[in-house]
Amino acid sequence: MTLNDIDLEKRIINIDHQLQRTSDMRYYVESTKTDAGKRKLPINEGVARCFAAIIEDREVPAVEKLIDGYGGFLFYDDKGMPLVAMHWEHRFNNMVDRYNTIYKIQMPNITPHVCRHTYCSNQAKSGMNPKTLQYLMGHSDIGVTMNVYTHLGLEDAADELKRIEALELARKEIEKKADTPPEQLLFRSV
C-alpha cells in the first residue's frame, strides 16, 4: 500500500494493485487477482486515525524505492525495501511464537489471511448486507464470501433466532396498538 492509495479526507482506500516479490528477491507490482478485487474501500474514523498515525510515524528510507512506477510505500524492512505479504506472515508468526512461549494456553496459528476471514465473519454476524460484504472483500462470487470466508456456528444461529423472535414480539405489540383507530393515535401524538 502506498500513500497515494489512502485518502484520509474522504476516508477511502484505493485497492487496484499488489506488491509481489519473486524468490530471487525481485519486486514487481501487478493488478489484483480479479476485477472485483479492484475497489475503493470506505474506512471508519478509527481506521482513518490508525492510518494517520502510521503515516505520521512512517520511517522513510534515505532513498525511497520506485517499483514499476509506485513509491511512497507505508512500510519498509530494515534494508529499505517495501514489505510484502511474506513479511507480514513472518511478523504474525513471531508474535504467536512469543505469546506461546510465555502463556500456558496456546494461541493457534494466525496469519493476515485469517484476519480477512475474521473480518468477514464479524461483518456477517453484525448483519451487514451480503452484497456489500462481497464488495468489501473483493470477491467476484458471493458464494466465496458467504461459504468460504464467513464462519458461523450454533451460537450465531441461536442469536439470530433470538433476534427474529424479538422482532416478531415487537410486531405483535404494534398490532395490538393498531386496534386503536388511527385518528385517535394521531390525536394522542399531537
Label every PLM stretch briefly.
Residues 1-19, 131:
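Short, charged phosphate-coordinating catalytic segments
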Residues 16-18, 46, 78:
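Generic beta-structure capping elements
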Residues 41, 57-66, 70-82, 86-135, ...:
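Short, basic (Lys/Arg/His-rich) helix/loop patches that form interaction surfaces
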